Structures are given as C-alpha cells and as structure tokens.
Amino acid sequence: MLFATLEHILTHISFSTISIVITIHLITLLVRELGRLRDSSEKGMIVTFFSITGFLVSRWVSSGHFPLSNLYESLIFLSWALYILHTIPKIQNSKNDLSTITTPSTILTQGFATSGLLTEMHQSTILVPALQSQWLMMHVSMMLLSYATLLCGSLLSAAILIIRFRNNFHFFSKKKKNVLNKTFFFSEIAFFYAKRSALKSAPVPSFPNYYKYQLTERLDSWSYRIISLGFTLLTIGILCGAVWANEAWGSYWNWDPKETWAFITWTIFAIYLHSRTNPNWKGTNSALIASIGFLIIWICYFGINLLGIGLHSYGSFTLTPK
C-alpha cells in the first residue's frame, strides 16, 4: 500500500510538473521578453526526471522485477527515456534544440499513462511465466530506448520537410510572425543575426535562404545522429529478443505481429541510413523516409498493443466495456 501511494504521488507530480513546463515553454515562445522563464522550465524537467526515476525504482522494489511488464509501465519508461534525450545537448554544451520535441512528447506519453484508460494496469502484478527472464530488462529497455530515439529523430526530419516546403518563408516579416517561427529551429535566427557583420556584402533577399539552409543542415545533422543511435539500440533490442525467444519458445524468429513490425521498422531506418551514403538522397529524400518511420514506430509499439494479438499480447491495452 505504501509503494502504491508513493507511485501515485510521484506519477502525478511528474505529470503536473511537465504540464507547467510546457506552459512556460509556450509562454516564452509567445513573449520573448520572458525568456528567463526557460531556466524555470529546465528545473521543472529535472523535477520530472527524478519523479519518474523514483516511480520506476519504487515499482521495481515493490514488484521484484524491472517495471516493463505492461503498456502502462512501458509508457512511463518511454517518458523517462525522452528526458534522457532532452539532456544530450546539455552534456555537449550546445543549444537544446530537442526541447520543443522532447517536452511535448513527454507530456503526451505521461498523460496517456496516467489517464483512466490504463487504470487496470496501475497496480503491479506478478510476471507471467513468459516474462520471468533476465532478458526482460535488456530486451524491452533497449526497444523502448530505441523507440524514444527514433521518434525524436523522425520528428526532426519532419521539421526539415516543413521548413523546406513551407510557402512564403520569411524570417523578418512582421505580418507573419507566429508560433512556428519562434520554435526551437527558428530561434537560431538570433545566433546568425548576431554574426550578420560577416554577411553585410550579401543582398537582403538572400538572408532567408541562408538561414533556411543553415537551420535545415543543423536539424539534418541532429536527426542523422539521433536516428543512428536509435537504429543501434533497435538492433541490439531485436537481437536480445531473438535470443530470449529461442529460450522461451524454441525459435529465434516466429513472425509474430510485433516481430514483423519491428523488422519493418528496422528496414525503414536501415534504408534511411543507407540513403545518407548517397549525396543525392541527403536532405529532403532521407527526411521523407524518416518521417514514414515515425508512423511505423507507432504501429509497432502502440498499434499491436491495441490489437492484443500474437505472442507479445501480454500487458496489452484493451478497452473494457462499462
């Protein structure tokens, strides 16, 4: 009872904090004079991280196994993984371009996990025999870490497509200022504008194209690095799952719906990484492939759980009639 109460408190603290964080983030986008509030949002993300970590540890101690046995626990772990990605730019002492992706993603996963739809999964239960293995932590954690990384990388690629295909792209138009112009990738304007002295010889109309090129190149670089990391984690997760499947079911691969879509996901991002070796496919073409991968990941992770079919149906989400 004590652990259940603690988990309930920590979960709602993390959700409430991340809600405040995203509100602050939106305010700073709309009102540039309140830019100092970003420090508060970063502190809020730290509180969220420790709350989610506390929940996972509490769940681990109370249940006796790593908390990855159902959709509810995996969503909490996914939000924790998104925060880890949120801290990567800080470790590299670079601008946190990922915050506009990781913060909303965290609140969405956290919000769905704490919603009434998954109430029956909130209580920890004894593992089913198929999950009573040391491979549980290795396989599932690698898969969820890869999902979080690939989702962020795919969203960055989608941002590239939005920038390149957006009509009437003007950075300095006073009549067309909106939230999109002030999100993480457009905030780079201030950085380049500070160095405008080196570009005084260039005509004014060339500025938007120059900024557009610089921003897309930066996003493309981030997307490639994050997807490369996610692809590596996905490969490790699939290999661990194959070994575990051989121990549990006597076969490395069974073409279960979850396994099939994991293979499709792996193939899509393998094509993306291969396309990066061809200069003609870099940029828009590779970003399009990664954007398709975004939908494939959600089908693999969430869609199969909705159907509740196959060998991976335990811990799935089903709507119960009232």
From Swiss-Prot:
Keyword Mitochondrion attached: no
GO biological-process terms attached to the record: cytochrome complex assembly
Alphabetical UniProt keywords: Chloroplast, Cytochrome c-type biogenesis, Membrane, Plastid, Thylakoid, Transmembrane, Transmembrane helix
UniProt key word Thylakoid: yes
Compartment annotation: Plastid, Chloroplast thylakoid membrane
Gene Ontology cellular-component annotations: chloroplast thylakoid membrane; plasma membrane
Recorded topology in the membrane: Multi-pass membrane protein
GO molecular function: heme binding
Residues annotated as transmembrane: 9-29, 44-64, 68-88, 143-163, 226-246, 260-274, 289-309
Quaternary structure, from the entry: May interact with Ccs1.
Assigned protein family: Belongs to the CcmF/CycK/Ccl1/NrfE/CcsA family.
Summary of the function given for this chain in its UniProt record: Required during biogenesis of c-type cytochromes (cytochrome c6 and cytochrome f) at the step of heme attachment.
HAMAP family: CytC_CcsA (MF_01391)
Protein's name according to its UniProt entry: Cytochrome c biogenesis protein CcsA
Organism from which the protein derives: Hordeum vulgare
